[in-house]
């Protein structure tokens, strides 16, 4: 069930991304939305954040206090992570209502954590530029994959309690 749902969701997502391919460089809707929400969160911490479309790729430039810090690309929008999460949950399908509610709640949590991690990364890079690689390579993935792992553990626990004799 995992592989099948993962392949179907990934195919649908890739078809969605194909819809946004054009000669004009501008990211897909979700990537743009994540960039806008990250900008708002960073700004709420009294930083002057702004996003601008990248001139030569499908991404948004993230600028904090007039310093270009990062690109927000399609891989930053958490959709691929949500697909991975959903595929795992569906491979342990429980009662329909419970499974769908958990999928929705998990997707919202992952999406929100993704916005938070982008804000942490941007502020961290701005304040501690010498730690850019560490923040992006270790802390950044740890936040999102740690969240997914915890959600998976919770789901397996719920599922196993519902199916124990």
What do the predicted segments below correspond to?
Residues 1-165:
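Hydrophobic N-terminal alpha-helices or hydrophobic patches in metabolic proteins across all domains
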């Amino acid at each position: 069930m995992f592989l099948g749902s993962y392949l179907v969701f990934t195919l649908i997502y890739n078809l969605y991304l194909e819809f946004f391919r054009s000669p004009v460089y501008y990211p897909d809707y979700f990537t743009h939305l994540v960039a806008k929400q990250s900008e708002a969160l960073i700004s709420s911490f009294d930083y002057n954040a702004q996003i601008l479309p990248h001139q030569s790729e499908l991404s948004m430039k993230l600028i904090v206090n007039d310093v270009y810090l990062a690109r927000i690309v399609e891989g930053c929008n958490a959709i691929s992570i949500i697909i991975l999460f959903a595929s795992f949950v569906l491979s342990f399908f429980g009662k329909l209502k419970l499974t769908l509610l958990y999928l929705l709640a998990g997707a919202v949590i992952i999406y929100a954590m993704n916005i938070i991690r982008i804000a942490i990364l941007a502020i961290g890079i701005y304040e501690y530029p010498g730690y850019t690689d560490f923040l992006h390579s270790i802390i950044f993935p740890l936040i999102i994959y740690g969240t997914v792992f915890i959600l998976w553990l919770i789901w397996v626990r719920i599922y196993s309690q519902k199916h124990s004799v």
